[in-house]
């Protein structure tokens, strides 16, 4: 190989290595962000389910009161 090709190859390897190291340094933060987003969404889903359960209990209690008020035929 000529020296010109070796220098070009060397610079190409340096550029690729720099880009890869930047990409690999982003991976832990990306994974952490995905995990925290999933946990946050899961907490929101659980809190929404709790609210739905409370609303269901309120509706059942109101329905029982309404049925108690109806006359028996």
UniProtKB/Swiss-Prot annotation:
Disulfide bond sites: none
Subcellular location: Secreted
Maturation propeptide residues: 45-73
Alphabetical keyword list: Amidation, Antibiotic, Antimicrobial, Fungicide, Secreted, Signal
Stated consequence of mutating residue 29 to K: In StigA6; gain of antibacterial activity towards Gram-negative bacteria, and towards the Gram-positive E.faecalis, increase in activity towards fungal strains, and increase in antiparasitic activity
Domain of life of the source: Eukaryota
Protein name: Stigmurin
Organism lineage: Eukaryota, Metazoa, Ecdysozoa, Arthropoda, Chelicerata
């Amino acid at each position: 190989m000529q020296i010109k090709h070796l220098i070009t190859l060397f610079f190409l390897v340096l550029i690729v290595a720099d880009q890869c190291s930047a990409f690999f340094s982003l991976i832990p933060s990306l994974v952490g962000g995905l995990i925290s987003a999933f946990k946050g969404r899961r907490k929101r889903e659980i809190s929404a389910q709790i609210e739905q359960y409370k609303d269901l209990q309120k509706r059942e209690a109101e329905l029982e009161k309404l049925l108690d008020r109806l006359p028996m035929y």
